[in-house]
Amino acid sequence: MNEEYLNYCQKAYQKILAANNILIVSHLHPDVDALSSVGIMIELAESLDKKYLAYASDKDEKIFDFLPHSERIHSKLPIGFSFNDYDLVIVLDCGAINRTGLAEALHNRNKKKIYVVEFDHHPPVDHFADIEIRVPHLASATEVLYHFLKVNNITINKNLSSLLLSGILTDTGNFLYPSTSDETINIASEMLRSGAQLPKIFQNTLQNKNLASMKLWGLALKNLKLNSKYDLAVSVLTKEEIAEVKNEVGFDEASSDVFGDIIGLLGNLGGMKGVILFREELDGRVKASLRTSDPEIDISRLASLFGGGGHPKASGLLTHGKIIQKNDGWEFEY
């Protein structure tokens, strides 16, 4: 982190110390990195005896209950909630304001009374925060928060170490994704020495796949095609295939991280410069996840051609179109 971000981290901590009532927010359908980040802020708020509310819209109440403080995170805003009751809002792992579920309140807030601090590792989409601590080259939001804790000399206890390691492990695909750096590994090692429970994290993430995940993995592997011209591996999941799995075994497509798991699995294919997973949405749009481990390729440039974006090694897009099966593979019409 450069000096500017060090100053931002110090200023953000001063705002936390001065706050009377803190609203801690992450993105809708939160993943492990998002909930771990919220848990870190809960741990900090409670250690400072601060009044707070933690909120992540449509949080899965079962899958992530192994995380410290997960039971304190509201999946729906409580009855009687008023945004104006809070003088500090902390937004975590959520660059797009509409994914907080509080976009209107954040946009229309009284900036003299309500201060907003954002911690994120995604490329910027909206600039809505008063302090924006955004470090896109870091592997996870929890890695950003690790530096925040260190800058402010906050002791990393057992709860914090487990939360930090959980976010790092899941957002790096257990250190397989290109975003993993030497520093990421060193931080993870430090968290183990600080008391993080690695077997418990593995059991509840890597070894906790459901039947729907396995069936969708199978379909993605069955549909996998190789493009020898561009050294790309491409797979698709049609809306009919997704609907069939949902009808057979049931799963919440929006809250499931299965699609992220699939693109991570496809990324293990050797000899390819990149992988793309297309999936059809019910509303006629197509989502795509793009990954590369080639040091010479910025996959976000390809995503940007279709209105998407992201990191150089991991990007996504959402556009209107359809997937058409051909004899020799798939075509994407938009």
Residue positions per predicted region:
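Hydrophobic helix-and-loop "lid/oligomerization" segment in the mid-to-C-terminal part
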Residues: 2-28, 34-68, 80-88, 170-334
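Short glycine-rich anion-binding loops that position phosphate/pyrophosphate groups of nucleotides
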Residues: 29-30, 94-97, 122-123, 240
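Short glycine-/acidic-enriched loop or helix-start segments at secondary-structure transitions
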Residues: 34-35, 99-103, 128, 287
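A short helix->loop->beta-strand "cap" motif at the edges of active sites that frequently abuts
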Residues: 48-50, 111-115
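Short acidic-hydrophobic, aromatic-tinged amphipathic segments that line or gate anion-handling sites
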Residues: 72-79, 133-136
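Glycine-rich phosphate-binding loop
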Residues: 87-100
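Short, conserved loop/helix-junction motifs that constitute active-site signature segments
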Residues: 103-113
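Short alpha-helices
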Residues: 119-187
